Amino acid sequence: MEDLQLVLFVLGAIAIVAVLVHGFWSIRKQQPRTIKEQPRTPYAMSPGRRDAEGFDADGIGEVRVRKLAPDDKKSEPVKASHDDTFSLSDEPKVRRVKERQEPVLESRADAAPNHAAHERRGHDFRHHEEPSPSARQVQLGLLDDLDQEPSQGELYEEINASVADYDDDYDAYENQPASVDRAEAARVPADQGQAAHSAATQAEPQAKAEEPLPDPRDVLVLHVVAREGQVLAGAELLPCLLELNFKYGDMEIFHRHEDNAGNGKVLFSLANMLKPGTFDPDTMEQFNTHGIVLFMTLPCHGEAVMNFSLMLNSACQLADDLDALVLDGQRQLWSDATKAQYLARIRANA
């Protein structure tokens, strides 16, 4: 009996060992090959990534390994040697630089006209023209007269008195002969002819320099004043001036130039009606005044009638935007009779 148990124990042990061996063999068979046993083929070198000629998408071919022949010898390093001999073949190749041609200097007699022409061209592109000494004196004199500005109460008393006399002045204006209207109507074709002539002159390749203006003989003045009990606020005044193409410039006041961008000659100017008559754009938000004054000297650049019309339209536009009144140079209400007087003064100084 004991022999039978021993035999069964041995057979069971052999069966267990056989099962274990078979299990390890099955696991080893199903396990993939290790990395060392697998061929290392890069992703770019796979057959699916290359064309028929062996080039990949970037145009790079397969890497070729060249075996070193047994008789190949390593290249010996070049030994530095000092040689005092010099040959033309040893010269480094120098890139030829094209010689710069120096400008030929002109004589003083020939360069003077060209220098004057350059000064004229540069003068045309200046944003702010320096006024002539005589015109500057007129502007300074006008600003000095601001010291004698009446108080607001006296100003409105003059306005009320002018309203009472307005009807009489208007009747007298209507009774005037029609010669003024005929002369103004006859002047329109002449103005158009002069405008066409000026345009043709600008089209010429070499335009003559403008002649300097003579000394001012007259000054046309317009006032824009606030209504009684009100003031003109700088926060509202500055946008209106910029919209009307006024540019802040010389003498710390605003100017209207020939070009809307602020280029060219000054046509007329705008100053504060109260002392000292200047503006400060940095403090316009806190600025208040009872009125402003627009003035134009005669003779002026361009057409005086057109310049005056532009100044009058600017004054009326400011009065409409700021709810103000337009007065003449004598601080009277603006009327058609006053306009006729101003036109007569323009024709007298033409």
Curated annotation (Swiss-Prot):
Segments in the Periplasmic topological domain: 1-6
Gene Ontology CC entries for this record: cell division site; plasma membrane
Compositional bias ranges of the Basic and acidic residues kind: 65-109, 116-131
Pfam short name (any one): ZipA_C
Main location: membrane
Topology term for the membrane: Single-pass type I membrane protein
Gene3D superfamilies on file: ZipA, C-terminal FtsZ-binding domain (3.30.1400.10)
Any one GO biological process: FtsZ-dependent cytokinesis
Location of region: Disordered: 36-55, 65-136, 187-213
Keywords: Cell cycle, Cell division, Cell inner membrane, Cell membrane, Membrane, Transmembrane, Transmembrane helix
Keyword DNA-binding set for record: no
Topological domains annotated Cytoplasmic: 28-350
Stretches that traverse the bilayer: 7-27
Location in the cell: Cell inner membrane
Family annotation (InterPro entries): Cell_div_ZipA, ZipA_FtsZ-bd_C, ZipA_FtsZ-bd_C_sf
PANTHER family in alphabetical order: CELL DIVISION PROTEIN ZIPA
UniProt record similarity statement: Belongs to the ZipA family.
Protein function: Essential cell division protein that stabilizes the FtsZ protofilaments by cross-linking them and that serves as a cytoplasmic membrane anchor for the Z ring. Also required for the recruitment to the septal ring of downstream cell division proteins.
Name of this protein: Cell division protein ZipA
Gene source species: Shewanella amazonensis (strain ATCC BAA-1098 / SB2B)
